[in-house]
């Protein structure tokens, strides 16, 4: 996919619009299987996984050694069913088209753990806030497929606040959706999303009300979890508004919902959103959470703002040192991606005060989030992405680094001359490196690869240039706020 890398380089460096279409580039040539090489699910619950693959269509998919209870649709690459027996199941996936064939192993873990790699998908909050409805969500699901995002591993479509009716069902206490926004109900949306090989997420709050003052989940945890299961929900983001700001309250309330989700009869990924208070990285995994917010909300800013309006650099500074808490099924969450909003997001622009990042800064934002093994949740309008946004969100090298099954979060290993260097170990014994220029002036960096790897023979893939010729060192010029990312892996 060197063409895409070259296109991205032109987009982020010279900031020109181009006529080439990312989707066309993704669907040329022999099949390539992307995304996670491992996925988890609870036993006796619905399983859904789409083999993420690009290449010329049609592609015919096949699977060897699927666990009993699962079936693969050979045309769509969607695997679904129910597995009763816990265990580790290595599955051989084959994809064939007119241009060639590829084989990839997929490890299916049926047991107690979900989100074995960082969740990838989309969330409604940054761009839409309360302006959500059934029609828009269905269009967003279609856009995730038609853009090529699903075929690169994006799978969650997450509804944030404001899906609620004015009150719960007075007789049963069950949550009720706003009938004007969702005339066919939430199950209808879930069924549609699932038919596309995607998963549906929803939002609630550990308090009596959500941050938007809709009804919260406090004291209704079991009712809500079972209702979400009936609706076909696959992920819950659980906020912390209208709650006494005490650690004991956080632990108690998040545990109740964690227990309720575990007993819901469905594999529901649990996102804890208490903005980093009380060090959630230390206790969320014990309560059943899969990822946790490390800071207050992100805004469309490179740097500056205050404690409740975090910029990319604010969040990045707070992330250093948290890497030891990240791993398979438990991830630090530095909040959603800003990429593609350009100051137009209803939430992230702060009502138009913040004008957004440059494409160079959006790429750096995406690159460092990928290196940090963060959940990658886009929150722009997928229906109207420009080519730069598509190229950034669908950068195959960054996504591969993020989804690496070793599950390591990058560490900052240098901050010399305002160039921050990050290193992330990868499952094949290689490393990913990122060089971020945090200053407002161009920096020249001399990279000696031997400082970062013990491998004697290796290849180098640049996230913006494709495969490079290996030399002992490489000198690069980094523009202000620019990031370059390299993946090093052993050669035979």
PLM features: residue spans?
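Strand-loop-strand motifs at the edges of beta-sheets in extracellular beta-sandwich domains
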Residues: 69-85
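Aromatic-lined carbohydrate-binding/catalytic grooves of carbohydrate-active enzymes
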Residues: 126, 139-140, 144-247
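Carbohydrate-binding surface patches
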Residues: 363, 369-372, 377-379, 415-454
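C-terminal beta-strand-rich structural cap/linker in extracellular carbohydrate-active enzymes
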Residues: 470-492
